[in-house]
Design a protein with these regions (language model features):
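Amphipathic, charge-rich alpha-helical segments that serve as recognition/docking helices
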Residues: 89-175, 199
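Charged, alpha-helix-enriched surfaces in structured cytosolic catalytic cores
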Residues: 9, 29, 47-55, 85-86, ...
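Short, charged/polar connector segments at secondary-structure boundaries
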Residues: 1-104, 113-121
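Low-complexity, flexible helical/coil segments
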Residues: 66-73, 103-104, 117-120, 135-142, ...
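Amphipathic alpha-helical extensions and coiled-coil-like segments
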Residues: 132-136, 154, 164-273
């Protein structure tokens, strides 16, 4: 591990090149040209040019960046942003050429934990963002030697106040294909349904998504559980999926759906193989 004195020497030498230096919480803040910055690899949080970004841009124009970002040396030159992607974008939109940052020489796992923890408490985070963020942090903590699946999951959710079980459910969502995960993001598919469907193979999920779009019916938790069971028993196909989705609500027993009705939801070329 590099000593603090060595870190200060390196940061100061960079400051000699670009000027402007101050100290925040004992760490040197340096102004870095924004064209030397690179996004964090597989950054799971979306940076939108929305109304909130407009407000941030106006604040940056008026007051500058009040909280420096955190970066680390990038292998090909420049710096990888660990914390501060929205501030970086705001600087671009505000027409600034530099951004104040703290440069840390940290490994991938440490950088991942910082990246997730500095974003996870935002109010407008999508389920998909949490899913991939929690998965990345979980894997990072495991690499760092965290023992036990349950204990690690609890550590992952500690910053955001999520239980270990909730973290595990979010991580399951990372196994969904993008089309189904989008439905979870827009609240058309509940998280519990998405979690159950995440156990299906990619091909099975594609069949479910096609059926959902054709029937315009979102699976209930009970239907998703039934679909999952069919998958575990190696019995899941298009016919089974349509049959389960078209079951009448609150029926005590299974309902037989006619081949003619099921076939009406398929393109002509696909009907023979399904019915």
């Amino acid at each position: 591990m590099r000593s603090k004195s060595a870190e200060k020497v390196k940061l100061s030498s960079f400051d000699d090149l670009f000027g402007k230096e101050e100290t925040v919480s004992g760490e040197v803040v340096t102004s870095v040209p924004i064209d030397l910055l690179h996004p964090f690899k597989n950054h799971p949080f979306h940076v939108q040019d929305d109304e909130k970004m407009e407000e941030t841009v106006e604040s940056v124009k008026q007051y500058g960046i009040l909280m420096p970002g955190i970066v680390r040396p990038y292998p090909d030159g420049g710096y990888e942003v660990v914390a501060g992607h929205r501030r970086w974008r705001a600087c671009e939109l505000a027409g600034l050429e530099e951004m104040p940052v703290i440069i840390r020489d940290i490994d991938d796992d440490t950088a991942t934990v910082i990246m997730v923890d500095t974003n996870i408490q935002r109010e407008d985070i999508l389920p998909s963002e949490k899913a991939f963020a929690y998965k990345m942090k979980y894997e990072a903590l495991k690499h760092q030697g965290s023992k036990g699946e349950k204990y690690t999951a609890e550590m992952v959710g500690e910053t955001a106040g999520d239980s270990g079980r909730t973290v595990q459910r979010y991580i399951r969502l990372a196994n969904l294909i993008s089309g189904l995960l989008d439905l979870v993001d827009v609240k058309k598919v509940p998280m519990i349904v998405g979690e159950k469907l995440s156990y299906l193979t990619r091909e099975e999920q594609e069949l479910v998504l096609e059926a959902v779009r054709n029937c315009e019916i979102m699976p209930t938790a009970a239907q998703a559980e039934a679909i999952k069971m069919f998958s575990e028993e190696k019995k899941l196909d298009g016919n089974a999926i349509y049959g389960l989705l078209l079951k009448k609500k609150n029926s005590g027993n299974g309902v037989t759906i006619s081949a003619k009705k099921i076939s009406s939801y398929f393109p002509p070329a696909d009907r023979k193989s399904v019915v």
